[in-house]
């Protein structure tokens, strides 16, 4: 029964992947401890077997990561919160991501919160360096 369920879920995912236009699928991340005590992050899906197959099904599997820290002035006083956004594009820090980038223009972790920046870089329309200015909304 569970094998059939997994097969149907994978079939549905492949159906979405094979649509005749660009498809973006989003998922929450599932944190998992591996046999060595390290933390791994997988797309959150109903079955572990299906979770681990997802990166092999799609051309691009990315993870959006947000880091916040207290911002301080020169005297060390709190002046607000600083937010940084990153997109993980490869196996890094326990994240299971990948990008099919023929130009190999992307780093394992890109400092941006905008997926369109990554696609511009892969098309060769942008320099390899994404600056702070590029990430501001």
State the predicted function of each range.
Residues 28:
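Conserved H-loop
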Residues 15, 31-137:
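Conserved GTP-binding G-domain of TRAFAC-class P-loop NTPases and closely related GTPase folds
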Residues 19-25:
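Loop/turn-to-beta-strand initiation segments
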Residues 1-5, 39:
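Flexible beta-alpha connector loops of hexameric P-loop NTPases
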Residues 5-12:
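Phosphate-interacting basic helix/loop segments used at nucleotide- and nucleic-acid interfaces
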């Amino acid at each position: 029964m569970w094998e059939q369920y997994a097969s149907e879920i994978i079939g549905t995912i492949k159906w979405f992947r094979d649509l005749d236009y660009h498809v973006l699928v989003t998922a929450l991340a599932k944190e998992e401890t591996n046999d060595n005590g390290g933390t791994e992050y997988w797309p959150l899906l109903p079955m572990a077997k299906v979770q681990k197959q997802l990166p092999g099904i799609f051309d691009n599997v990315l993870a959006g990561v947000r880091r916040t820290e207290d911002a301080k002035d020169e005297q060390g006083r709190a002046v607000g919160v600083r937010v940084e956004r990153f997109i993980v594009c490869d196996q890094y820090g326990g994240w299971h991501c990948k990008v099919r980038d023929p130009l190999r223009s992307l780093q394992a972790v890109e400092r941006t919160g905008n997926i369109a920046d990554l696609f511009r870089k892969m098309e060769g329309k942008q320099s390899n360096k994404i600056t702070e200015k590029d990430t501001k909304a």
